[in-house]
């Protein structure tokens, strides 16, 4: 999807037992302004991700992830990056069928044991249609720097709020 206006995306919940993501996309500000704005917003959610705080940035996108580790506690830091295409992904949630997806996408060069990394593998194969293969509770922002496109999605029930 491409828009000319800046987009700010975040997840939030009354519960503190979940990660949070913040994304600023298509902003016309400087990279420094975008990063500063994203970090200010994300700082308000930091209590929800005591295990890790990670940032991805390029000239037109910033993704910030505050992580509460559930699966792959040692190496599942986010945002996750596709090592070949440089696609960036920030996810809040859990992909229940990640083991089956990992088997069916065995050619993808997995870097972690994170259940969420299967989203990057599916994106390579299916583009935006990847969401049809996911089972679980999730919200995510995926940014593809090759064409400056992005996907913003959540589970069909909306267990993880996305704004």
Describe the residue ranges of each PLM region:
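N-terminus-centric sequence/structural signature that marks the extreme N-terminus
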Residues: 15-163
């Amino acid at each position: 999807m491409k828009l000319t206006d800046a987009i700010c995306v975040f997840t939030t919940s009354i519960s503190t037992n979940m990660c949070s993501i913040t994304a600023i996309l298509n902003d016309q500000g400087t990279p420094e302004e975008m990063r500063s704005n994203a970090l200010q917003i994300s700082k308000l959610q930091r209590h929800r991700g005591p295990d890790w705080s990670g940032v991805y940035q390029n000239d037109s996108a910033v993704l910030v992830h505050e992580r509460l580790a559930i699966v792959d506690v040692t190496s599942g830091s986010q945002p996750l990056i596709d090592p070949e295409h440089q696609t960036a992904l920030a996810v809040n949630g859990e992909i229940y069928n990640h083991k089956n997806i990992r088997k069916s996408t065995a050619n993808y060069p997995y870097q972690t044991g994170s259940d969420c990394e299967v989203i990057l593998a599916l994106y390579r194969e299916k583009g935006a249609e990847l969401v049809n293969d996911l089972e679980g509770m999730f919200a995510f922002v995926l940014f593809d720097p090759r064409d400056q496109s992005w996907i913003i999605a959540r589970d069909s029930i909306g267990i993880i709020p996305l704004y």
